Regions:
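Extracytoplasmic electron-transfer domains, predominantly the class I c-type cytochrome c fold
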Residues: 75-119, 126-133
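Periplasmic/extracellular electron-transfer cofactor-ligation site
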Residues: 27-30, 51-78, 108-114, 136-143
Length: 149
């Protein structure tokens, strides 16, 4: 069998739909290098683990680029957080939250704003997810290391 489509409009409708659906559901490219986020180096393996979790649990509300524009966002009373701007109400004075504070917020969720708690997720997964979320904003790459209490 030979398919000869010149662009999407020249394809049979079912094939065009299949291409659109499959092509729009691609995860972000894999990380091959570590990144410094919040002043600490995060391995490529951890970032890839976080990316996989994000695309499994978060992308429907927060969107592929972390902009809060996922397909489910339209049905929510409050818009999901836009991770690109790195502003968190639970951080003091508009600063970036500590890594553990971000992990804790993911775990507990924000039920009153539509974000479910992820209490059943392993600590390692929560941490990797928090690290991946940081990749959306340059603020995390520019941040100094967290102060040790």
């Amino acid at each position: 069998m030979t398919l000869s489509c010149r662009g999407l409009m020249g394809c049979p409708p079912t094939l065009a739909l299949w291409v659109l659906v499959c092509g729009c559901n691609q995860a972000a490219p894999a990380f091959t290098e570590p990144m410094t986020l919040g002043g600490r180096e995060v391995s490529a393996d951890t970032l890839n683990q976080g990316r996989d979790l994000y695309f499994k649990y978060c992308v429907s509300c927060h969107g592929e680029t972390g902009a809060g524009d996922g397909p489910a966002a339209r049905s929510l009373k409050f818009p999901p957080r836009d991770f690109r701007v790195a502003k968190f109400s639970f951080a003091k004075d508009g600063e970036l939250p500590a890594h553990q504070a971000l992990v804790d917020r993911i775990r507990s969720g924000v039920p009153e704003r539509g974000m479910p708690p992820w209490t059943g997720m392993r600590e390692e997964d929560l941490s990797a997810l928090a690290d991946y979320i940081k990749t959306f904003s340059p603020a995390w790459r520019e941040a100094a290391p967290e102060a040790v209490p």
